Amino acid sequence: MIDFRPFYQQIATTNLSDWLETLPLQLKEWETQTHGDYAKWSKIVDFLPDLHADEIDLKSAVKSDRTSPLSEGEKQRIIHHLKQLMPWRKGPYHLFGIHVDCEWRSDFKWDRVLPHLAPLQGRTILDVGCGSGYHMWRMVGEGAKMVVGIDPTELFLCQFEAVRKLLNNDRRANLIPLGIEQMQPLAAFDTVFSMGVLYHRKSPLDHLSQLKNQLVKGGELVLETLVVDGDVNTVLVPIDRYAKMKNVYFIPSVAALINWLEKVGFTNVRCVDVATTTLEEQRKTDWLENESLIDFLDPNDHSKTIEGYHAPKRAVILANK
């Protein structure tokens, strides 16, 4: 099982120390309610070899390597273990010559977001709904002091720990398997990311307030979410599914989203990027057995979802507390 005690020790002397009042008990409770496959997935992490990387690049990729390459047999054993943790959704990872080609080219999103951010050097960062942690490692690559990701999905936790093991057990990033609604208001993070989460929330304004409660005064929110065209009063509430996703509740226009953020008290709210999701950014690979974007779009008109809505378009909004 994954040991969270090193993280407790890390935060004990930081401005996250108040979290220790609740977090250890929450994670003990979490361990009693884990997915039936969690024990198997965590063992896969244990089975991965302890390799030392001579070269690690988190600035332009998430990559580890060493001067003496792995044998083909060693590579195949690692691939076998990593593929037992499929589906790999967010990446890519380049680990000792192994290309983990995930469904999403999350580096595309990072390249769109990064130029607009307050410098991450020396910052304490929270990544909400972090998945397997790809963007967390890129934040570390930008010089973040500490990155904490939260995501309740046990598979993502095990994927993250597998990658960490192949990055010389780097402790600058940590994934905690909780949702933001389970976090006490810490007001301790310099930057809070919420990317690809808001439209899954039944109460989007509550989510925005929860994000605000984790920021220091003056801290920066980085919000990335689905949007639709329209004015300040435009919000799509899909009747049943959106792009085959049942758990999509509210997709606002950019103007409506800015209004929401201002309504819960954020300042300096601005949209810095809008991009339609392409078939190059989200696609099927050998590391994903499920459907992907091509299956969610109208086969005769890729500008629409299979349900007839506009195809996925995502905005990046920055704001300050």
Curated annotation (Swiss-Prot):
Organism placement in taxonomy: Bacteria, Pseudomonadati, Pseudomonadota, Gammaproteobacteria, Pasteurellales
Q: Which reaction does it catalyse?
A: carboxy-S-adenosyl-L-methionine + 5-hydroxyuridine(34) in tRNA = 5-carboxymethoxyuridine(34) in tRNA + S-adenosyl-L-homocysteine + H(+)
Q: What general EC class does the enzyme of this chain belong to?
A: transferase
What's the source species for this entry? Haemophilus influenzae (strain PittGG)
Any single biological process term in GO: tRNA wobble uridine modification
Q: Which CDD domains match?
A: AdoMet_MTases
Which sites bind carboxy-S-adenosyl-L-methionine? Answer: 90, 104, 109, 129, 151-153, 180-181, 195, 199, 314
Q: Matching NCBIfam families, A to Z?
A: PRK15068.1 (NF011650), tRNA 5-methoxyuridine(34)/uridine 5-oxyacetic acid(34) synthase CmoB (TIGR00452)
Is the keyword tRNA processing assigned to this protein? yes
User: Taxonomically, which superkingdom?
Assistant: Bacteria
PANTHER family per UniProt:
METHYLTRANSFERASE (PTHR43464), TRNA U34 CARBOXYMETHYLTRANSFERASE (PTHR43464:SF95)
User: What pairs make up the disulfide bonds?
Assistant: none
Q: Which UniProt keywords apply?
A: Transferase, tRNA processing
Protein name, per record:
tRNA U34 carboxymethyltransferase
Its function, per the record, reads: Catalyzes carboxymethyl transfer from carboxy-S-adenosyl-L-methionine (Cx-SAM) to 5-hydroxyuridine (ho5U) to form 5-carboxymethoxyuridine (cmo5U) at position 34 in tRNAs.
Q: Which family does it belong to?
A: Belongs to the class I-like SAM-binding methyltransferase superfamily. CmoB family.
A Pfam family it matches: Methyltransf_9
Return the InterPro entries for the record: CmoB, Mo5U34_MeTrfas-like, SAM-dependent_MTases_sf
The UniProt subunit note reads as follows: Homotetramer.
Key word tRNA processing present: yes
Instruction: Spell out the molecular function terms from Gene Ontology.
Output: methyltransferase activity; transferase activity, transferring alkyl or aryl (other than methyl) groups
Entry EC number(s): 2.5.1.-
